[in-house]
Amino acid sequence: MGNFLLVHGAWCGGWVWRKVADRLRSFGHNVYTPSLSGMGDRSHLLSANISLQTHIEDIFNIVEFERLTNVVLVAHSYGGMVATGVADRIPDKIDALIYLNAALPQNGQAMLDLISDKRKNTVIRLAEQEGAGVGIPSSLIMETGIEDDREHAEFMSRTCLCL
């Protein structure tokens, strides 16, 4: 079956893919849902040294160390930045690249280049005020798309600073 590598977005971790991963596994696929450095269950690693390049390396290493080929790389939100970098680095190992409400950068663009100047200024200000200049606080989450109140509360309780 297929090798699915699911890349989460900002403020969360690999846990966000649990239901999707369970469903894909029920069809016999191999599914990987890593948390990016400094996020999710790896939030204790958050530091000023973590960057988009670190996150690209996180996902690249999954492909390399698991010796994956024919990968279906699925990205959500900020994960689109990461997946784009990975796909550029190892295009021969990626069968499909799926952007699920994800950032779709052009070469050389940063995440902040994809948002309005007003939002960019807010992000920078809050990162300095609430994120010690290192991370972006989850107070910036505008919409989760989760309609069930209990699931929304569960999601928000697990959010963390992101880069």
Features from the language model and the residues they span:
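Conserved HGGG/HGGXW glycine-rich cap/lid loop of the alpha/beta-hydrolase fold
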Residues: 2-43
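Structural signature of beta-strand start/N-cap positions in the alpha/beta core
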Residues: 3, 30, 70, 93-96
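Glycine-rich His-Gly loop
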Residues: 7-10, 76-77, 102
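Active-site signature of alpha/beta-hydrolase-fold catalytic machinery across serine-
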Residues: 19, 85-89
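Active-site loop/oxyanion-hole signature of alpha/beta-hydrolase fold enzymes
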Residues: 30-32, 38-72, 88-89, 112-116
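Gly/Ala-rich beta-loop-alpha elbow adjacent to hydrolase catalytic centers
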Residues: 74-79, 83
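Flexible "cap/lid" loop of the alpha/beta hydrolase fold
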Residues: 88-138
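Conserved alpha/beta-hydrolase catalytic His-Asp/Glu region
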Residues: 131-163
